[in-house]
Amino acid sequence: MKDANESKSYTIVIKLGSSSLVDEKTKEPKLAIMSLIVETVVKLRRMGHKVIIVSSGGIAVGLRTMRMNKRPKHLAEVQAIAAIGQGRLIGRWDLLFSQFDQRIAQILLTRNDILDWTQYKNAQNTINELLNMGVIPIVNENDTLSVREIKFGDNDTLSAITSALIHADYLFLLTDVDCLYTDNPRTNPDAMPILVVPDLSKGLPGVNTAGGSGSDVGTGGMETKLVAADLATNAGVHTLIMKSDTPANIGRIVEYMQTLELDDENKVKQAYNGDLTDLQKREFEKLKALNVPLHTKFIANDNKHHLKNREFWILHGLVSKGAVVIDQGAYAALTRKNKAGLLPAGVIDVQGTFHELECVDIKVGKKLPDGTLDPDFPLQTVGKARCNYTSSELTKIKGLHSDQIEEELGYNDSEYVAHRENLAFPPR
């Protein structure tokens, strides 16, 4: 770790929603905001940081171009509008960045692009190479090609996956409020700001995020930002929520982050007992004393506890085609420090239809004395795996010892249902 006096350089992802870039009523671009964002990103680059933008707005710009007031309902129409708008949107970014002689690159992703491990690594290598070349990658979901079943869902999720993909230090989620509140500040004047969240896995007691379903031109809301924060912090990425119409504050917040020691954040995380109240008071006084703009920071899991590259890919890059229900003993064996692979003896039930090496959810159930699944025991989804066997093969060998596989199937492709490198569980 660098000394406190040394300048720290970060990899920073900035996510901008459609409502940050396009007026919800007129559908006109917010060129002033875009210009401020460009100035901020250029300044961050000059400070030595690497920056990636995740930019929504292609569909919104397409609606404006085609003089349409509402988002179409049919998928083909939406994809056509996205194709029209995406070119114009990247053109605006290019024009603004060119005023500073800053080069950009467009990266359009679909979930299909990262379903394969080799493609996932290729995407990772491409973005990192662009950063090393001093280029600003501008990432968006390819709404022209992606289908509903395998979409990222929203660009909050895409920004979290992008952050994990490149091992970013910080993810900034820009929105229409300056931070997370205990309630909607527009409708509840008593809503209190939440400035730091040490551990999202412990929940957010006293915080109501319902009702923030996103704008007319976008798909996100506060709940999707919390999902993104959970994904990113589990991958070791600090995540921040801040107001989009003051993008210059990103630089001020980054300068503040440079003064912090890693131990300071770890101490806050370790001392956190689920009570947010006192913590917010201390954080508010600290930000006020240093004249740091309001924002919410979700502290990332440390290096020992965050998801590694392949684990994150399995959990969040792959789409589950079914589920494998295991007993509690198998789960304990899979999650200990030197975890083992999943053996057929630990499998109680198989759900859905899937092929070899497709992704499945791992669920924990209770085994009855006859070896079948207890229907009264609530199943808990605990992770994901890439299976060495199809669902029909696994149905035949579930509960058996590995040396019985060949007798049952006539062949033995592997003693494991899933090898340990093809298993992933969220940090506990």
Curated annotation (Swiss-Prot):
Q: Name the gene.
A: PRO1
Please give the chief subcellular localization of this protein. Answer: cytoplasm
Keyword Kinase found: yes
The EC number on file is 2.7.2.11
Signal peptide positions (record): none
GO CC annotations on file: cytoplasm; cytosol
What HAMAP family does this protein's entry cite? ProB (MF_00456)
Similarity annotation: Belongs to the glutamate 5-kinase family.
Which pathway is recorded for this entry? Amino-acid biosynthesis; L-proline biosynthesis; L-glutamate 5-semialdehyde from L-glutamate: step 1/2
Main role? Catalyzes the transfer of a phosphate group to glutamate to form glutamate 5-phosphate which rapidly cyclizes to 5-oxoproline.
SMART domains, A to Z: PUA
Q: What else is known?
A: Present with 10400 molecules/cell in log phase SD medium.
List ligand-binding residues for ATP. Answer: 175-176, 219-225
Query: Which residues of the sequence carry a binding annotation for substrate?
Result: 56, 143, 155
| GO BP terms | L-proline biosynthetic process; proline biosynthetic process; ribophagy
Question: What are the subcellular locations of this protein?
Answer: Cytoplasm
Which reactions is this enzyme annotated as catalysing? L-glutamate + ATP = L-glutamyl 5-phosphate + ADP
The record ties this protein, via InterPro entries, to: AceGlu_kinase-like_sf, Asp/Glu/Uridylate_kinase, G5K_ProB, Glu/AcGlu_kinase, Glu_5kinase, Glu_5kinase/COase_Synthase, Glutamate_5-kinase_CS, PUA
**Name of protein:** Glutamate 5-kinase
Q: Name one Pfam family in it.
A: PUA
User: Can you provide one Gene Ontology molecular function annotated for this UniProt record?
Assistant: glutamate 5-kinase activity
Q: Which organism is it from?
A: Saccharomyces cerevisiae (strain ATCC 204508 / S288c)
Keywords from UniProt, A to Z, are: Amino-acid biosynthesis, ATP-binding, Cytoplasm, Kinase, Nucleotide-binding, Proline biosynthesis, Transferase
Q: Where is the PUA domain?
A: 321-412
